[in-house]
């Protein structure tokens, strides 16, 4: 009998988007009889552990980045480039021990540029091949291209045609041959659709701070004005995840499982 392959799936912990789009990939790996090891940090790890409680998981420390509250983003991140490269180097070095300890056969890394290996199939998931900056675009694109080239393949969760989701972020220039457009990734299971017509409005948040909190405050004010049944999913994973009534019509909750969120969407 052929030995089951063990695949490390490791999303970035900047909001929950990277973790949630790994859910359909993990499901497909399990369907193909692979062992899956989840490697992440913070809320991304907590969320995937709740989605897949039977899977093994490990903490792979993430680069802690908090966006400035107002302007100066280019300078802010330019000053942190040495720190970014140092983190990528440390991440790459830590992968050797993970591969040895858990007998890893392949790696799927969502925007974690240090998680590649010379002798193991390594895939990077990203839709940011051509990061938009007000200046130094060529330099930034060159850096991203070099980082992407370390992986055997780069999967873009979008379509290749002009009618796409990510726009210039993944369609703005010459695309390396290792890039594969795999189509949008959804954690929703078509078989679990159930109608839930109770609420009229649904807002789903995710992303790095302080922007997530700032947008949450704006959305709460706007949803109050609607005066209809509404639910705000904050995109925050915590032990206490009870729904909170902000008004008679507006309910707020930290996060929802894929199935419960699908009920609200439908």
Give names to the regions the model predicted:
Residues 19-29, 43-44:
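Short amphipathic alpha-helix
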Residues 73-114:
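Conserved nucleotide-sugar donor-binding subdomain of glycosyltransferases
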Residues 11-23, 210-213:
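A short, glycine/small-residue-rich beta-strand->loop->alpha-helix junction that serves as a flexible
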Residues 118-181:
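Active-site-proximal region of nucleotide-activated glycan assembly enzymes
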Residues 26, 169-171, 183-266:
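Donor-nucleotide binding loops and adjacent catalytic segments primarily
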């Amino acid at each position: 009998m052929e030995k089951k392959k063990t695949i490390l799936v490791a999303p970035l912990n900047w909001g929950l988007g990277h973790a949630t789009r790994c859910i359909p990939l993990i499901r497909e790996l399990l369907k193909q009889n692979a062992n899956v090891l989840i490697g992440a940090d913070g809320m991304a790890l907590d969320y995937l552990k709740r989605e897949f409680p039977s899977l093994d998981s490990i903490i792979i420390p993430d680069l802690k980045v908090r966006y400035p509250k107002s302007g100066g983003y280019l300078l802010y991140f330019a000053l942190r480039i040495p720190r970014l490269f140092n983190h990528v180097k440390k991440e790459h070095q830590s992968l050797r021990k993970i591969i040895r300890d858990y007998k890893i056969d392949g790696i799927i890394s969502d925007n974690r540029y240090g998680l590649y290996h010379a002798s193991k199939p390594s895939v990077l998931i990203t839709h940011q091949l051509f990061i938009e900056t007000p200046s130094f675009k060529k330099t930034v694109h060159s850096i991203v291209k070099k980082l992407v080239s370390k992986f055997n393949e780069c999967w873009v969760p979008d379509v290749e045609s002009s009618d796409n989701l990510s726009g210039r972020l993944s369609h703005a220039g010459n695309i390396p041959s290792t890039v594969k457009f795999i189509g949008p990734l959804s954690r929703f299971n078509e078989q679990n659709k159930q109608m839930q017509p109770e609420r009229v409005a649904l807002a789903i948040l995710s992303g790095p701070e302080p922007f997530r909190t700032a947008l949450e405050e704006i959305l709460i004010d706007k949803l109050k004005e609607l005066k209809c049944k509404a639910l705000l999913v904050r995109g925050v994973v915590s032990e206490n995840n009870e729904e909170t009534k902000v008004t008679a019509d507006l309910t707020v909750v930290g996060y929802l499982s894929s199935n419960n969120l699908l009920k609200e969407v439908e």
